[in-house]
UniProtKB/Swiss-Prot annotation:
The keyword DNA-binding applies. GO terms for cellular component: nucleus. InterPro entries: B3_DNA-bd (IPR003340), DNA-bd_pseudobarrel_sf (IPR015300), REM16-like (IPR044837). Residues 8-23, 36-46 have a biased composition (Low complexity). Residues 1-78 are annotated as: Disordered. Residues 93-191 bind DNA. Its main location: nucleus. Transmembrane segments: none annotated. This is B3 domain-containing protein Os04g0386900. It comes from Oryza sativa subsp. japonica (Rice). It is found in: Nucleus.
C-alpha cells in the first residue's frame, strides 16, 4: 500500500499578497484634505489688496504711478585751489609783502608802470577781498603813488606776513581826475618761518632778507 505524501499548500491567486499595499493608501489626497500651504485663498488676496491703499508698505495704489527718481543735485562750484580766483582780465599788479607793508609805516608803493592807470592826485581807495571792503587813501603823484592811511587795517585784519603775495586788480580807476580807486585783492600765503622773518632787511624789495 502506497504511503500518501502531504504537499505544501499553495496560496490561491485570489488571496491578497502579504506585500501588497492597501488600495486606500495609493489614493492621491484631494486639495481639500491635504491643506496645501502654497495655494492662496482668492478672498484673502482681494482683502490684502484693498487694505494696502496708498499708505501700504511696498504697494502702489491702482491708478497711480511711481514718482520718478530725483535728479542729482548740481555740484557746488568748486573753489579754486588755495582760494585763488581767476583774474578778471583787468589791469593788475603784484606785490610781495615787505616789512614796510606789515609793519610801520604800513604802506604799499604802486609800481611806476601802473601810474598811467591811476589818478594823479590823492583820492579815496577801496580794497575788497572775500566779501569784505577796507577804505584807505591813495596818494597820487608823478614821483610816487601809494596806498596808505587805512592799509594797516587791511594788513592786520588779514594777518599779512612777510613774504605773502598780493594781487591788486584795478576795478575802478583810470588816469586824470578820477574821484576814487578800487582794487580787488587776493592774498597768497608764503608761510616763511618766523626765524627768517626776524632777520635784518626786507623793508623794501631793494633790501631783501639774505638767507645763508
Amino acid at each position: 500500500m502506497r504511503a500518501a505524501t502531504a504537499l505544501p499548500s499553495i496560496p490561491s491567486s485570489s488571496s491578497p499578497s502579504p506585500m501588497a499595499s492597501d488600495p486606500t493608501e495609493l489614493r492621491c489626497s484631494s486639495p481639500e484634505s491635504s491643506g496645501d500651504a502654497g495655494a492662496e485663498d482668492p478672498a484673502a488676496v482681494d482683502a490684502a489688496e484693498e487694505s494696502g491703499g496708498e499708505g501700504g508698505s511696498g504697494h502702489i495704489a491702482a491708478g497711480t504711478e511711481a514718482a520718478p527718481p530725483r535728479p542729482p543735485e548740481p555740484e557746488p562750484e568748486k573753489v579754486a585751489r588755495h582760494g585763488v580766483l581767476p583774474l578778471l582780465g583787468k589791469p593788475y599788479f603784484t606785490c610781495i609783502m615787505c616789512k614796510s607793508h606789515v609793519q610801520p609805516p604800513f604802506q604799499v608803493v604802486v609800481p611806476r608802470s601802473f601810474a598811467p592807470l591811476l589818478p594823479s592826485r590823492t583820492t579815496p581807495a577801496t580794497l575788497s577781498w572775500r566779501g569784505r571792503s577796507w577804505g584807505m587813501r591813495f596818494t597820487g603823484g608823478r614821483l610816487i603813488q601809494r596806498l596808505e592811511a587805512g592799509w594797516r587795517g587791511f594788513a592786520v585784519d588779514n594777518d599779512l606776513r612777510l613774504g605773502d603775495g598780493c594781487v591788486f586788480e584795478l576795478l575802478v580807476g583810470g588816469g586824470g581826475e578820477q574821484e576814487r580807486v578800487e582794487f580787488r585783492v587776493q592774498v597768497l600765503r608764503a608761510e616763511i618761518p618766523a626765524r627768517i622773518r626776524g632777520r635784518a632787511g626786507g623793508y623794501t624789495s631793494a633790501t631783501p632778507i639774505v638767507i645763508d
